[in-house]
From Swiss-Prot:
This is Phosphoribosylaminoimidazole-succinocarboxamide synthase. One of its GO terms (biological process) is 'de novo' IMP biosynthetic process. The lineage of its organism: Eukaryota, Fungi, Dikarya, Ascomycota, Saccharomycotina. The keyword Ligase applies. The keyword Nucleotide-binding applies. InterPro entries: SAICAR_synt/ADE2_N, SAICAR_synth, SAICAR_synthetase_CS. Pathway: Purine metabolism; IMP biosynthesis via de novo pathway; 5-amino-1-(5-phospho-D-ribosyl)imidazole-4-carboxamide from 5-amino-1-(5-phospho-D-ribosyl)imidazole-4-carboxylate: step 1/2. The gene is ADE1. Its EC number is 6.3.2.6. Belongs to the SAICAR synthetase family. It catalyses: 5-amino-1-(5-phospho-D-ribosyl)imidazole-4-carboxylate + L-aspartate + ATP = (2S)-2-[5-amino-1-(5-phospho-beta-D-ribosyl)imidazole-4-carboxamido]succinate + ADP + phosphate + 2 H(+).
Amino acid sequence: MTSTNLEGTFPLIAKGKVRDIYQVDDNTLLFVATDRISAYDVIMSNGIPNKGKILTKLSEFWFDFLPIENHLIKGDIFQKYPQLEPYRNQLEGRSLLVRKLKLIPLEVIVRGYITGSGWKEYQKSKTVHGIPIGDVVESQQITPIFTPSTKAEQGEHDENITKEQADKIVGKELCDRIEKIAIDLYTKARDYAATKGIIIADTKFEFGLDGDNIVLVDEVLTPDSSRFWNAAKYEVGKSQDSYDKQFLRDWLTSNGVAGKDGVAMPEDIVTETKSKYVEAYENLTGDKWQE
């Protein structure tokens, strides 16, 4: 399912790369995770079956696990809002009812390993987001670092920024708090995942404000927002066997279509990507995935 239509029951106020967001009332939003998948800031023309359900269940797992206030409103959405019943087949298993908060306009990225764009920057300048890093090789573990980016509008590209630039956007005091919270959350999740055979190389958090409280929002530690590696096959100095979008990115790059609009994934790429998401879910939660 790559799009939703609630036929005006609630207004659609935003359509992200994956999520359709509906306004329930002044204080409440409905997040619906579709099966859309994006890579290199472009949405593929076809989706990954039930990917939205996997992301939703995994986010719920981490919301429960992590010791921080989050935006989730628990309960059966169809009991709370009977008018949604006709759309059960669109919403069930892939919807989260959440508090509407003031969003902090940063992509809060924490890196515990040098890979991806961080590795590319390091090769040029021995820095990651302007932070000097000692001598390392690809995929090497480092002390976790906060590497924010701008939160771009749909169709625009997020831009990597320094901590000092982030300070100017949200204020130094708030940015310092966000940095500490994000690194603490990453570290707790990383240590847990290690017991399940998964390395969390990096991840992206998003936060909102409820008064002065920093609240965890959006999705949390999913294969869409993180790099998950197979710990059993981890080998420093090379690219890793992963449970995330890297498989799709590699296919796009090798076929010369990275960043191009309207690309359709062949069935084998869809199937393999789905299996990686399912494996990540099952390893991290200990639960068997049920379609």
